[in-house]
Amino acid sequence: MKLFVYHTPELTPTDHLPDCAVVIDVLRATTTIATALEAGAEAVQTFRDIDQLMETSDRWLPEKRIRAGERGGAKVEGFDLGNSPLDCTPEQMGGKRLFLTTTNGTRALQRVEKSPTVITAAIINRQATVNYLLDRQPETVWLVGSGWEGGYSLEDTVCAGAIAQSLVTALVQGIGMGNDEVTAAIALYSQFQNNLLQLFHQSSHGQRLLRLNCDEDLKYCAQPDLLGVLPIQKEPSVLVKFC
């Protein structure tokens, strides 16, 4: 297995794709996706464009859909939910499709959607991600951070480092570092693995969410291995629970 870390979707190569792309948006899209599927959503369908989301979701019965999204961390006006994973309860999600648009995570998903396998990862489902990669052993793996509007983010990098460190520990000689970003991500995780919430508070997007009174979201997003669910792309932009 050869492992690569890319801090934003814009930094990924444009002339080829990996065997498996792992999209990371810890604050908060991939945390929300995992939580929604664990809570019983039949699928999560992601969109970059709000108008496209509205057009597609209009084809679904109101009782079978939930529209969720944020721009700049704040809920999109007229939507059912924002992008808080804490809103993804079984009562809200059960048997419904979540139509989701976010500032960063949905852009990253679109960038790699043509890869043979696309999964999403966050701190809360790190071990499920690692288990899948160890079981399937894809030849090339990209860990793609969503960043913030094209820029680097601490929280996505530390999650990539958590996944990479577990893979390196398990595979020892059976893994190759595809770029220096892998080593840097592991180093960041090694430094903050016992205090992820502190790191999130220091990150620019974490501070943005704190200003929006999303303290509880940060606490939730910082809990390692809380869920055993693995979101996997069934078709472009549509994620389901891997079984």
From Swiss-Prot:
This protein's encoding gene: comB
Reactions the enzyme catalyzes: (2R)-O-phospho-3-sulfolactate + H2O = (2R)-3-sulfolactate + phosphate
HAMAP family from the UniProt entry: ComB
Family of the protein in this entry: Belongs to the ComB family.
GO MF term set: 2-phosphosulfolactate phosphatase activity; magnesium ion binding; sulfopyruvate decarboxylase activity
Cofactor names: Mg(2+)
PANTHER family given in the database record: 2-PHOSPHOSULFOLACTATE PHOSPHATASE-RELATED
Name of the molecule in the record: Probable 2-phosphosulfolactate phosphatase
Superkingdom to which the source organism belongs: Bacteria
Magnesium as UniProt keyword: yes
UniProtKB keywords: Hydrolase, Magnesium
Natural source organism: Rippkaea orientalis (strain PCC 8801 / RF-1) (Cyanothece sp. (strain PCC 8801))
E.C. number(s) listed in UniProt: 3.1.3.71
One Pfam family, short name: 2-ph_phosp
